Amino acid sequence: MALTLYVASSNAGKLRDFRVAAGHTATEILPLPGLAEIDAPEETGTTFAENARLKAEFYSRCRPGGLVLADDSGLEVRALGLLPGVRSARFAEDAEYLPGSPLSADERNNLLLMDRMRGVEDRAGRYVCVLSVARDGVEIASAEGEVAGEILGVPQGTGGFGYDPLFYLPELEKTMAEIDLETKLRLSHRGAALRVLLARLPG
């Protein structure tokens, strides 16, 4: 029996990633209807798992009976004490870095990361993604995925989003922003988490 998952995210890149990762299954990935009109909950969790569950349970109340998928994901850099972590999307905003700049949030986040990593020898980092599915305010499944890499000093590639241009995969000698979408989803934290999650959902 086919499943329909309503994604509680306005991030077009994430929605695309989920659809590609689920493409070989009977699962239909749809945006949550009316998401733009819903006031987002405050992400008060201190871990990716807490925030993913909080969002899934909150948004599932807006789609009675439906399965709502939420994620919390980000970048952890060892030399920065695992920052930006759960604040990855708001890294520059939290630091009041380039306020009022016409640059996008992703661009400012990447610039701040480059600044913080200037002269740092330990370049190890990892992407982490936790997915949660809830129905009627109750989490019914969750899964985590991660991928290890290195943080570059300058961006490479124009694909992807977020920190992808700085996230280097040594085994491919490319950044996440330089690989095709199929390869990215095969290797990425988000693709790994979704594959585990789909196996855990009730048929």
Swiss-Prot record:
Disulfide bonds: none
Quaternary structure annotation from Swiss-Prot or TrEMBL: Homodimer.
Gene3D superfamilies the UniProt entry points to: 3.90.950.10
Protein function: Pyrophosphatase that catalyzes the hydrolysis of nucleoside triphosphates to their monophosphate derivatives, with a high preference for the non-canonical purine nucleotides XTP (xanthosine triphosphate), dITP (deoxyinosine triphosphate) and ITP. Seems to function as a house-cleaning enzyme that removes non-canonical purine nucleotides from the nucleotide pool, thus preventing their incorporation into DNA/RNA and avoiding chromosomal lesions.
Chain positions recorded as Mg(2+) binding sites: 42, 72
Example of a GO MF term: metal ion binding
EC number: 3.6.1.66
Protein name, per record: dITP/XTP pyrophosphatase
Cofactor details (free text): Binds 1 Mg(2+) ion per subunit.
Origin: domain of life: Bacteria
GO cellular component: cytosol
Entry keyword set: Hydrolase, Magnesium, Metal-binding, Nucleotide metabolism, Nucleotide-binding
Family to which the UniProt record says this protein belongs: Belongs to the HAM1 NTPase family.
GO biological process terms on file: nucleotide metabolic process; purine nucleoside triphosphate catabolic process
HAMAP family per record: Non_canon_purine_NTPase
Catalytic residues as annotated in Swiss-Prot or TrEMBL: 72
Cofactor annotation: Mg(2+)
Catalytic reaction(s) noted: XTP + H2O = XMP + diphosphate + H(+); dITP + H2O = dIMP + diphosphate + H(+); ITP + H2O = IMP + diphosphate + H(+)
Binding residues annotated for substrate, in chain numbering: 9-14, 73, 161-164, 184, 189-190
